[in-house]
Amino acid sequence: MQFKKQLMVIFLAYFLVVNESEAFFGHLFKLATKIIPSLFRRKNQRSRSIMKRDLENLFDPYQRNLELDRLLKQLPNY
């Protein structure tokens, strides 16, 4: 009877440790799968944000108005 109780305690302890370690390593794996791609994406996003900023500057409405004003001032009636 004592031997069965010891086996049961060992089995339950092993079961808890395995489940906890599985949950722990599963959580680490989830974090790794989210962090690792984001490291590679940052380089692309930086260049993309620079390109986006260049496009915003290129098509900035205030900039267009300044150029339009400059061109209109060249006309004699403006």
Swiss-Prot record:
Its localization reads: Secreted; Target cell membrane
Arginine amide PTM sites in chain numbering: 41
Tissues expressing this chain: Expressed by the venom gland.
GO BP, one example?
defense response to bacterium
Propeptide residue range(s)? 42-78
Spell out the activity-pH relationship: Has great tolerance to the acidic, neutral and alkaline environments.
**Transmembrane region(s):** none
- Keyword set for this entry? Amidation, Antibiotic, Antimicrobial, Cleavage on pair of basic residues, Membrane, Secreted, Signal, Target cell membrane, Target membrane
Entry comment, domain topic? Amphipathic and cationic peptide with an alpha-helical structure.
Q: What is this protein called?
A: Antimicrobial peptide marcin-18
Per the UniProt record, the source organism is Olivierus martensii (Manchurian scorpion)
